[in-house]
Amino acid sequence: MTVESTGFKASDVLAGNLQKVLTDVTALSLVGKQLHWNITGEGFRSLHLYLDDVVDIAREASDEIAERMRALQVVPNGLPEVVAQRNTLPTVPETIIKTDAAEELAVAAINATVGTMREVHEKVDAEDSASADILNDYIRRFEQQAWFIRSQNGQA
């Protein structure tokens, strides 16, 4: 951490940790839409709508995290090849998916994203509590969405 005449500047460690989160939330928005478009079966409508909520939160998170990175004088990278190569989310099939399988995939993708946030949280908080507060908010929101999705079939 350094404070310069231009303000607080993130260390390479903080920048790298925020980039990991940015990569996963960006991937989550894509995975969420892939599932949203290709689900079929019982409970379609409610899962379809839950996935829209997940995507909306993921897009909001990616924007907030990227803008926080810029405020800390870091260049965020949301390029498709970076997101594709570096995200930690499970792979989603390129086919029609039954709702029960889609629920499992959605929860796994959310949990992977939250896992990344929890993994980097302590190091982020040690350097920048404001960035850690952002992570706290999205951890709470994503875990709530995972609970909603699991609960619709009595899995919570």
Residue ranges of predicted features:
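Acidic/histidine-rich alpha-helical segments that form the ligand environment
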Residues: 67, 81-137
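Helix-loop segments that flank and shape redox-cofactor active sites
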Residues: 6-13, 28-54, 116-130
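Disorder-to-helix initiation segments
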Residues: 2-21, 99-102, 106
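Amphipathic, non-transmembrane alpha-helical scaffold segments
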Residues: 18, 22, 48-55, 59, ...
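A structural signal for well-ordered alpha-helices, especially hydrophobic packing surfaces
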Residues: 22, 29-32, 36, 55, ...
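Conserved alpha-helical segments that form or flank metal/cofactor-binding pockets of metalloenzymes
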Residues: 43-82, 152
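Heptad-repeat coiled-coil alpha-helices
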Residues: 34, 38-41, 71, 78, ...
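Charge-rich, acidic-biased intrinsically disordered regions
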Residues: 2, 6-9, 45-46, 52-53, ...
